[in-house]
Curated annotation (Swiss-Prot):
Residues 50-69 are annotated as: Disordered. GO terms for molecular function: ATP binding; CMP kinase activity; dCMP kinase activity. This is Cytidylate kinase. The keyword Thylakoid does not apply.
Length: 212
């Protein structure tokens, strides 16, 4: 395969897809883009300006003004931004504004991208598509540990409820709902640590690429 390789990784929040995508990008020498960070950055920009993330006009304006520097902020993974990003991601004009950003990122040298609609909307022609998931309880435990590592303890039950609400919003939104692409390979990481998940994913990628 001589053209740039695109690996699309989709799945619900806290499924391990981000960690997996970063490791695959390093292993296959490809750029990496966490597309969920785009929506977080847009949400952060709206909040900073005192706007409502659910306001289509305000969120679209910030989506069209987004730069790569916005993705480097250290305050994009707070509970407030989590909730705001979910609202932003449901707005069709915002998703349209960010679509070109994502495609241009991978055009020149390929990429590993993770999100919720990479294999279905952003890169339906991706060379490899993975759908990474895990049980709600496992994902809630992972997210809770992440919060604790950042000095935040909202409680496990609160995190679990937050993820369940995010899952429902992702699955039912009109704009690019979270679904497994028909040709995506399923990887359930419920019983896997990060190393096991990476090994399994890398094997899947190599098998697909070997078929040409």
């Amino acid at each position: 395969m001589t053209r740039p390789i695109v690996i699309a990784i989709d799945g619900p929040a806290a499924s391990g897809k981000g960690t997996l995508a970063r490791r695959l990008a390093a292993a296959f020498n490809l750029p990496y883009l966490d597309t969920g960070l785009l929506y977080r950055a847009v949400a952060r920009r709206v909040l900073d300006r005192g706007g409502d993330p659910a306001d289509p006009a305000a969120s679209e304006e910030q989506a069209r003004s987004l730069s790569r520097l916005d993705l480097e902020r250290g305050d994009l993974r707070t509970p407030e931004v989590d909730r705001a990003a979910s609202a932003v991601a449901s707005i069709k004009p915002v998703r349209a504004a960010l679509l070109d950003f994502q495609r241009r990122f991978a055009d020149a040298s390929g990429a590993v991208l993770d999100g919720r609609d990479i294999g279905t909307i952003v890169f339906p022609e991706a060379d490899v598509k993975l759908f990474v998931t895990a049980s709600l309880d496992v994902r809630a435990k992972r997210r809770h540990l992440e919060r604790l590592a950042h000095g935040i303890d909202p409680g496990f039950d609160s995190v679990r409820a937050e993820l369940a609400a995010r899952d429902e919003a992702d699955r039912t939104r009109a704009a690019a709902p979270l679904v497994q692409a028909k040709d995506a390979l399923l990887l359930d990481t419920s019983q896997m640590d990060a190393n096991h998940a990476f090994t399994a994913a890398a094997d899947l990628v190599n098998k697909v690429l070997a078929r040409g």
